[in-house]
């Protein structure tokens, strides 16, 4: 599966609504889109999520559940660079 970094930028004043929805309904991911890990920016206005899927169109399906609360950027990740001592 390909991995993606998802950058969610929360709309001003929407953080309480985001967490309320998340606690009530979960991530609401469609089948085939897998959450791996996430990190919040220090001020909490952006969330960086590592996800994987073989069908990047699923991001749009997922974002329909959240688009009223922010915007999303999806970045396809490449292979991890290898150091000279790695085989």
Predicted segments, located by residue:
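A common structural junction motif
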Residues: 27, 66-73
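Short S/T/G/P-rich N-terminal loop/turn motif that feeds into the first structured element of a domain
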Residues: 1-46, 54-58, 78-87
């Amino acid at each position: 599966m390909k991995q993606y970094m998802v950058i969610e930028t929360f709309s001003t004043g929407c953080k309480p609504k985001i967490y309320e929805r998340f606690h009530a309904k979960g991530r609401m991911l469609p089948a085939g889109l897998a959450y791996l890990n996430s990190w919040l920016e220090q001020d909490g206005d952006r969330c960086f999520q590592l996800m994987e899927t073989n069908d990047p169109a699923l991001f749009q399906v997922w974002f329909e559940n959240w688009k009223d609360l922010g915007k999303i950027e999806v970045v396809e990740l490449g292979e991890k660079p290898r150091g000279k001592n790695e085989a």
